[in-house]
């Protein structure tokens, strides 16, 4: 009993803790096969629609700006990568702030020459970057030639504090490994 009372008092005194009621989470799945500008515009339309339907956390598909291109090994796809703070973050930072929502926006990250990641921003409702996740488990199977493109992530599994709760991000194959869910 005392432990329960202590935990409740501790949680409510934490400025980052609030009781979340009726959170609506939108997971957007759509076909992306155009250039980055068109794909980002299409994703933005769906973010807008989800927010207007009451979603407070909106998750976009893997590699949302570029599309999933890993079915073939082609060096031209490296041209689709962007640095941190690039077009994906810029677009969804403005949109998250405008709509007051959290957006999980996966993208093809160019960390430095020769080092690329399959990454995702967690953009808070004020437009700031609340988190960055780099996919840890990289498959190399027929139609999933990801090791040709991506270096395994080095940021670990952790959650990001946002105005709409703590968000733990995993990308595709990472969800098959139980430690990822336990640690985020």
Describe the function of each predicted region.
Residues 38-47, 177-182:
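Short, acidic/polar
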Residues 36, 45-126, 132:
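Cys-nucleophile CN-hydrolase/nitrilase-fold catalytic domain and related Cys-dependent amidase chemistry
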Residues 82, 94, 111-184:
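Active-site catalytic loop in hydrolytic enzyme cores
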Residues 29-34:
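Short polar catalytic/cofactor-binding loops
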Residues 21-25:
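Extreme N-terminal starter segment of soluble prokaryotic enzymes
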Residues 26-28, 58, 168-170:
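Hydrophobic positions in the central parallel beta-sheet of the AAA+
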Residues 8-19:
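Short, Lys/Arg-enriched N-terminal segments with co-localized hydrophobic residues
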């Amino acid at each position: 009993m005392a432990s329960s009372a202590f935990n409740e008092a501790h949680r409510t005194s934490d400025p980052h803790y609030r009781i979340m009621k009726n959170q609506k989470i939108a997971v957007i799945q759509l076909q992306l096969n155009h250039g980055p500008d068109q794909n980002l515009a299409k994703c933005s339309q769906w973010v807008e629609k989800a927010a207007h339907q009451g979603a407070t956390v909106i998750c976009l598909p893997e590699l949302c700006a570029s599309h999933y291109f890993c079915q073939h090994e082609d060096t031209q796809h490296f041209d689709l990568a962007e640095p941190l703070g690039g077009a994906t973050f810029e677009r969804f930072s403005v949109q998250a702030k405008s709509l007051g929502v959290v957006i999980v926006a996966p993208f093809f990250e160019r960390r430095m020459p020769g080092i690329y990641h399959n990454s995702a921003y967690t953009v808070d409702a004020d437009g700031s970057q609340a988190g960055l996740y780099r996919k840890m488990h990289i498959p190399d199977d027929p139609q999933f030639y990801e090791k040709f493109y991506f270096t395994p992530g080095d940021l670990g599994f952790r959650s990001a504090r946002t105005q709409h709760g703590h968000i733990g991000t995993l990308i595709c194959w990472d969800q098959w490994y139980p430690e990822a869910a336990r640690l985020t």
